[in-house]
Each structure stands twice: as C-alpha cells, then as structure tokens.
Amino acid sequence: MVPEPAPAAATEPRRSTRRRLMTAAAMEAEAEAVADLDEIDREMSRAESRKRQRRTAKEKPGARKGATEWKPEDVEKAAAAEGVAELDEIDREMPRPELRKRQRRTAKEKPSAHEGATEWKPEDVEKAAAQEPEGTELDSGLSPAESRGKRQRGVEKVKRRTRKKTAKEKTKETTEKSAAQAPEKMKVNDAGGALAEDVCADEPDAEQMAMEEEEEAADVLEAEERMGKCVGEGSAEKAATRKRVARPSTARRVEDSDDHFVGDPVPDDEARQRWPVRYSRKGSDSLLKQEPDEDEEMKARCHYLAANVDDEIYHLDDDVYVKAGPDEENYIGRITEFFEGVDRGSYFSCQWFFRTADTVISSKLLKVHDHRHNHKRVFLSKEKNDNLIECIVSKVKIAHVDPNMTPQARAHAISDCDLYYDMSYSVAYSTFANLPADNDGALGSEATSNISCDDADNSSKGKLSADIVAPYSEQTETASLLDLYSGCGAMSTGLCLGFAFSGINLETRWAVDINKYACACLKHNHPYSQVRNEKTEDFLALIQQWDALCRKYVVHKNDTLEPSIDMPLNDADDVNEPLPEDIFDVEELLEICYGDPSNTGKNGLWFKVRWKGYDPSYDTWEPIDGLSDCPERIKEFVEKGHKENILPLPGAVDVICGGPPCQGISGFNRFRKHNDPLEDEKNKQLVVFMDIVKYLRPKYVLMENVVDILKFADGFLGRYAMSCLVAMNYQARLGMMAAGYYGLPQFRMRAFLWGALPSMVLPKFPLPTHDAVVRGIVPTTFSQSVVAYNEVDTRCLRKALLLADAISDLPKVGNDQPKDVIEYSVAPKTEFQRYIRNNRKDIQDYSFRGDDPSEEGKLFDHQPLKLNKDDYERVQRIPVKKGANFRDLKGVIVGPDNTVRLDPNISRERLSSGKPLVPDYAISFVKGKSTKPFGRLWWDETVPTVVTRAEPHNQIILHPSQDRVLTIRENARLQGFPDYYRLIGPLKEKYIQVGNAVAIPVARALGYALGLAYRGESDGDRAVLKLPESFIYADQETVVKSSAGTPGSEIADSEQLFE
C-alpha cells in the first residue's frame, strides 16, 4: 500500500485509501505544462492573425469573386511576396500540423478536387467557433489555459469536421432506412466472396487520417497530463476515501478528555485470542513505538467492551456517526473494538459504511433523472480504521434488509430506522455485492454477527421478490442468453464455450444487431438462435408489445388460453366461402416486428403476411390495425411463437450480454458533450440497454465497452451503467481485461460490468492465464478494476503469445485472393494453432445442438483486402524485416528528432501511375514522427489491437513475409475465433465484424466464471478467481488427434513457427 500523508488535525477521523497526493515535483511539472500551453496559445493566435492579414492584402476586391479556393500559382506568388523566412517562422510557431497541412493540400489540389463542396472563409470559421457554447472545455475539467488552447486549435478544425458531419449524416440516414426495413434472410453464398468494392482505396480517407492522428495525439497528451496531475481531484469517491487512511495523531491523551472506557479490561488471554494482531510483536521495541508503520496494525495495551463518550455509553457492534472534516457529513461506522494504545490513547476501531455519495456512483459525479437511490441506503464495507473515541458523535439505527424483499416489504422494514443496508461495497473492482449469509451482514474475520435492528422480523414481515429463482440443482433446461448489439456473435459464443466448461449448457436464444451481415454471420454459426436485424430500441418496443399479446392470448405459466378475447373469431363455416376479387385472405402470419418496414412514416407493430392463393413473393408487411378482422390468425401466431420462444419475456431470460455503442466518447473530439454525455444521441444506446435489462430482469447481465467509457467525463457513462444496476437492486462489479492476458498476440483492453440479481451469486473476474506486452493507458480513477495478478504472483502465467504462435501455419496467399474457402497446406505448429483448428465438439461448442457441420481440413475467410495498384507497388518495396515501414523507401530521410522528410538531393521517385512512391500523407502523419504508414508486422511481435479497416496508409498491418495486409482469418485468429467460425458478407464487412468483436478467449474466461456463479459456487468473497490449468486449452491428446483431420504424427515441432 502506498504511504499516506499525516492528518491535518488530531481529532479528525481518517479512513482508508490507496491514493497518493501530488508531489512537489509533480506540481512543478504541472505548472510548467500550463505555462507551455499558454505560450502555444499566444503563438497560434499571432500566426492566425498574420495569416488572415496576408489573405486580405493579396486578394483584390472582385478579382476572386465566386472563387472557392486558391489556385497553386496564387499560393506560390503569395509565398514569394512574403518570403521564405516568414513561412519558416510560421512553421516554427505552429505546434500542431493542421494549418500547414491544409496550406499544402490547398496548394496541390486542383479546383475540381472539391467541386460542389463549400469552402469556409476565415470569417466563417470564426463565426462557427463563436457559436459553440461557452464553458465546454472548462466544465470538462481543463484548466483555463488548456481551454483557450483547445478553443483556438478547434477553429482550424471546423471546416474539416463540418464536411465530415455531412458524410456521417448521409451514412446514418442510409443505415436507419436499411434497419427500418424487414429483416432479410441471407444465404451464406450471397456474400461469401470478394466484391468489386472490396479493394483498398487509392488514397486514405482524409477525415479518418485526421481523426486517428488526433486520437494518437490525445493519447500522448493524456499520458503527459497524468504525469503532473493530482490523482483524485474532482472525484467524490476519491475525496471520500482519501479521508480514510491516515493514522490518528497521538497529541491528545486520554486524560485530556472526559471520555473514557467503561468497566474492567477484557482478560488478557481473551483479548489476545480475539484480536491477536494487536498484541503480536515484530521486534523487541514494538510496544514502545509511538507511531505505527503504514499498513501496520496499531498495537494495544488492553481491550475494553464499552466506552463513555459525552455521557453516552457505547458498546461493541453499535452503529455510530463519526466526526468528519469541515463541511463534510459525519462518517458512518460500526464499532468493532475499544482499546488502549501503546501511547495510552483511548481508541476505537470502526468498520465503515459508505453512502451512495462515497461510491463510484456518487450523485456528485452523476446527475441523471431516469433513476435515483434511496437516501437511507448505505453499503457496508471491509474498510476499518482506528480513531480516538472522542471522534464518536452519536448512535444511529441501521437495519440490515434482505435484498430479495419486494419494494413494499422493504418500505415497511426501513420505516422505523435511520438507515438501512442490503449490500456491501468495495473500492476494488467497484463491487456492490450481497453480504455473506454466514455472518448476517458483518464483513471481515473480526466482525460479529450482531446488527443494529432485528432483521429477522423484517424479513418475515414482507413477501420475497419474484426475482428469487430455484437452485441450479432443480433446473434441468439449458440456460438462455440474449445477445444485444451482437455483431457476429463473438461475446455470446465465448460465454457459451466457457459456460460449457463449467458443466452447464448456455444457448444464445436471441440476438439483435443493426448490421445485416453481422446478423447473417451469427445465424450461420448459431442456427437455432432467433436473430433479429433491427434497431435495439425497436426491439425493446417489440418485446413490450409481445408480452401484451402473450398476456392476451396465452397464460404465461400454464400455456392455456385466456377465457376471453376481445377481438371476435371468424365463423369457421365461412372459411371456404369464395371471396370478392378485391379482398385478400390471410393464410398465415410469418413474422413480427416493431418499426416501419413499409416506410409509411409511422412506427408500430407489424406482421409479415402470407396471402392465401399467392406464393411467397407476394408476402407483405401489414400493421396490426389492418388485421383486426382476422384475430384467429394473430392468436395462432402468438400461441406458436410463445411455444417456440421466438421473443424473450420478462423473467424468462437467464443472461443478457452486449456492448452498447457509445460513439459519442470516441476520439479527440472537441464537440463531445462532457457535461452531459447522455444528451449525445451517439451515447443513447447505453440507456436503451439498461431499459431492456430493467424490463426483462435477467438473472445475469454482462456489459462490455471500450475503456474510454471510464475515461471520458470522469467515467460518466461507466458510472451511469453501474448506478442503473444498483438502482434496480442488482449486484454489480466492474473490471478491465486485456485480451493478451488470455492467450492472444494482441493487447486490446476492454471494460466489463457484471450484474446479478440479489438471489444469485455475483460472478468473479477470471485472472490472466498468460503474460502480455502491455500497451495503452489505464484510467487512473479505476486502476483498482484492472484484472491482474500482483507483481509477485505473475510466476504462474504462461509466456506471452506472439504473432508467429497464431498465424505461422496459414497458407501463403497473394494480394488478390477471391476464394473464401481453401485448404490447409501445413500441419499446426503451436499449441494455439492446434486448439484453434479444433472442431465444434472438441471445443465444446453446442450451438448446433450436437450436430457438427464443420468441414474437416477447410479454411474459411483467408482473404486479404486487395490493395490498389499504387499501394501494392509500395508494399512490394517495403523490406521483409522487423520494423520495416515507409521510412525504408527511397528518398526518405529521418532527422535526429525522429521526424521524416524527403531527401532534397534526389528527385522524387514515382510509381508507374505517376504518383509519388512516398505519399505526402505518410510524411505528414503525426507531424512526421509516425512509423505506422505501410508498417510491416513481425513474427516475434504482438499487435496493439485488431483493426476494422485493413488499409495500410496509417497503421501497421502488413504481413511479416508476404506483400499484403493481414487476411480476415489472420485477424480472426488474433481475436481467438476458431477456424470453423465462418464470417459472412463482403470483405470489408468481415473485417468490421472481426475488428468489433470481443476477443473470444476473454469471453470464454468470463463464461466460465459466469457458469460457476450460476451453479451457486461462490468460493469466498474475493472479486477474482484463478482459472484451472486445463481451461487454457483442451486435452492435448484430443487436440492433436482432431486438428483439422491431420494425424498426430504429422504435427510439426512447436518451435518451427515460420517458413
């Protein structure tokens, strides 16, 4: 534990934390950083002013009327008139490259390059910047100097971002229109091969390049700011915990106060047995030490059972208010000890309760209106500290309430108590959990079983909640899973694999995603799943309507018909009567959806209708209002759908998993809503996800998201998700897991949030199985949520996997590979390769319910994105060596500051098309300091993450020994997809499916932990568990025998990793 500072006052109680205050060196560094930012701001302001003056002076009135941009000769004349020296001065003054890049781009582009685009003038840019709401940067926690710098730099981004916005809006409209239509049934062969559009673009997307450059710069800025930032500022939780550590001062002795212990001391033998740590001696002088070392238990001379404070008698296990600092609410704790210290001070030990404001979901950081927490609710913790008895303020009546009570019974139970608690809270992994049943609400080995109010009477007064489920031993059916924002199904697939390893079957019963190709992929690999290609908010409306229909036509519990149905049934005698020519008879209802599949402009409940006497090509979507004259068809459809479980009903879902997209937090976007991220439409899916959880009340919830959810706006969205679960009376636990730690040659860290009904065991996070090459930045505030071993315990980890371990056995393919099914050419070379080639049965994948259609020896999706002619020529000239990239091309010079430039002594080499061999965007990317453009991976390396775009213009994605980008299958291997898992759609869509997926080994490890919890196996109250050795890979004999049909004798030596 990090040492903590001494308290400011002797009488102020302290409670525990793991934070360190800012050092003098850090404060000095921060001051220097602010000064540098101020200087940059002033330089940019002067440069921008001179730029506008030059434009005004050089542009004659009327001469440029109607022109939309400068011609190259105009730019050259202006530069010559002002002199090269002046331009050099401007370059030196511009720390960010946007202005210079835009000048170069404008000088080299022909007027037709932006035909039809609106050119922004300087005054337009200023006007747009002025319209932005003030205080955005300041409210996000930036200093005034940082805010001014961001605002000035942001002016130059307005033009570029405005063009991007238009493109995004068009994409959004197209996507929403596609999603609103009826779900399509796709055949595997419809999108299995390469299409004409599956070719790398001739030039990189300027907006994408700029965004990724800014993101890289943002990472650097975040790392630099963290070096000088005081850990814990601005966080209510950290402020609260910071007050819980410092040892009490011994300036005031017991004789200085009227407060005193009551009665005789506890007999020495009994005291040493109950509190042995207080009397242990590490050295001969331990009893003489006036100040204990940090993390060392304060030593005692003797113990007592009661104390008199302000003429009030306090006993062990009393709940009390404890004096806090100035302008703070009194702390809440439970007395666990009274003792006289070796300094003869009178102390008590207190086990702390946390208010909601003291936790990760503090209302001081999270101001929302869609849910709230009871102000009487507190959470018991394991945190303890020693304080002088004079810090006790008064008693408080706290009731322990059964978390499974109904709201009515809970209200009755807490009506005569000051506060109540039904869960514990721990800062580690931000855990809200049930209290251990064996100690009835007390935590820790020294805590007793007494509580402030008799909760036995409270429990008997009310009715237990309907959330209570039968023990696992009484359940025989396969557990059901709903996968929201499913993508191609990676997370649900991994969860099912891990669940099976724990001895239970979990089936992806339902899945929802807006991407039709991802839905087709999931359906192909999970044929028994009900896969819906629609917006998630429409799915929520649909299941609400479906529940109403089932209540109308079917009784949930016994599947019998309701005694009365509002809509009259048609007379059976009229079935065969001929119909008028202009009337169509409904033969059967095929599907149901909510939305507007017929583009009528009105959302509602629709049925897909098969018309009598017509083939399927005449099927149409009809609103439920238009089917009022055929209620018997609706009844038949609902009865059949209810029996087949086509849609989930409240209380009938075991697990919900999903990764709601929060695109409003991505990138270095100055237009992000720091003050209220939920106001951004791009973050609304998080609310929809929680609304579905609230409606369906599954036993378990697992939400996945990018780590930025815990970085942006002080982790607002992550805190919101946890707050929603706790407000819904779910247990919750937050962790961050990196894919590399679970046996993959990549790092990619993701945030995971467990939720569990109070009647279930809260799942733990599985500890790593492998070492990994650490990349990226962990949010400091949530550093205790990183799932990892302590540094001394890493000896149990396997070696980190490298690129060769994953892909060295795959066949050699060229830049243009049209076949999506080929055969293996060599035997597997590593343990990972042998496992990843296994069939469904050996990997325990039961998505086909026992059948295994895997084609032995067949390899799917081993296709690269085809490079265009220019890029292919460039890639062919990148050397086959470690660390190779565009800097190895002819004509590039690397300066002493690691900045690249063209060699002025030789002519610029050209491609066969006439374009330069070394493109301008590669030289200017990240101010010329990046080594990513046309970078080649190497066998003994790992990748930082698996990308969704396979273009080499600004990322290291070239194969180590072949002149192409990594194939879809190679990327899938890096994500842990078994080779039998087939992707569906155009090549670019397949890259997106793999890149957006949760790494399957991570999901599998989580699934194993979920399976144990589902079985009721808690194994203590630790937040993490160690995976069994047999979990990492299947039994070795089974693996070798079944590796894609290759006999075990032909398995290559594991050390022969590449050709």
From Swiss-Prot:
Residues 312-436 form the BAH domain. Residues 479-1017 form the SAM-dependent MTase C5-type domain. The active site is at 662. InterPro entries: BAH_dom, BAH_sf, C5-Methyltransferase, C5_DNA_meth_AS, C5_MeTfrase, Chromo-like_dom_sf, Chromo/chromo_shadow_dom, Chromo_domain. GO terms for biological process: DNA methylation-dependent constitutive heterochromatin formation; methylation; negative regulation of gene expression via chromosomal CpG island methylation. Its EC number is 2.1.1.37. Residues 29-41 have a biased composition (Acidic residues). Gene3D superfamilies: 2.30.30.490, DNA Methylase, subunit A, domain 2, Vaccinia Virus protein VP39. The keyword Methyltransferase applies. Residues 1-196, 230-272 are annotated as: Disordered. Its main location: nucleus. It is found in: Nucleus. Residues 158-167 have a biased composition (Basic residues). Keywords: DNA-binding, Methyltransferase, Nucleus, S-adenosyl-L-methionine, Transferase. GO terms for cellular component: nucleus. This is DNA (cytosine-5)-methyltransferase CMT1. It comes from Oryza sativa subsp. japonica (Rice).
